[in-house]
Amino acid sequence: NVNLERVHVYRSGGMSLIAEYSKDITVKEFSTAAHAGSPRMITSSADATHFVNCKGQVKLENCQFESMLDDATNIHGIYMLVDTLLNSNVVRASFGHFQQEGNYFAEPGDMMRFVDKATLKPVGQGKLISIDKTDRKSYVIETEFDASAVDAPAGLAIENISCDASAVIRGCTVRYNRARSLLLSTLGDVLVENCEFKSQMSGINV
């Protein structure tokens, strides 16, 4: 469990808070507002908070997100693109963006879902048996799913559906930022209540 309470970030050169492959995160009274009277127009040059491939629940309560150049929060998983079928249930898969390289992604026992990368429609799933991360750009992934049964295995992507956290966002204020307030693409249950959004783009993007 991770608990952050009464944390004030007055300036950050990137994201103010980022969590990857963590579980059950609670953030209370977190602020990216500038000091009172400060002439500063920008506090965080990217997202205020960002949660990637997390498990359990992400909870944001009574937070004040101001003057970011991106979202107040972004909660999502990660896809890996299947490059090569090495065996019926073993594939080599790579990340779609260089900033994802080296991501922890999964551990044995996690549930892997295979999707058509053109449509993102599921084609099958199975538990992860083993994962070789020797190459930080591409991993060798062994699962219980027979990928050879798919017509075009190279047209697949893999997501770790054990890492789609639910989210509770309550009593938060978002304002003076140029992007969205909440970007929520997790598969988990989401509750947003008693919040105020004054962002340049959409308040809630699901």
What positions do the PLM features span?
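Ser/Thr/Gly-rich low-complexity blocks that favor extended beta-strand/coil architectures
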Residues: E101-R136
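A structural detector for beta-sheet-dominated domains
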Residues: E20, V52, H76, S94-G96, ...
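Small/polar beta-strand repeat architecture
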Residues: G124-Q125, I131-V168, R175
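Short alpha-helix capping/helix-loop boundary micro-motifs
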Residues: V91-E101
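Short glycine/acidic-rich loop motifs that flank beta-strands on beta-rich extracellular proteins
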Residues: G13-A19, H35-D47, G56, L69-I75, ...
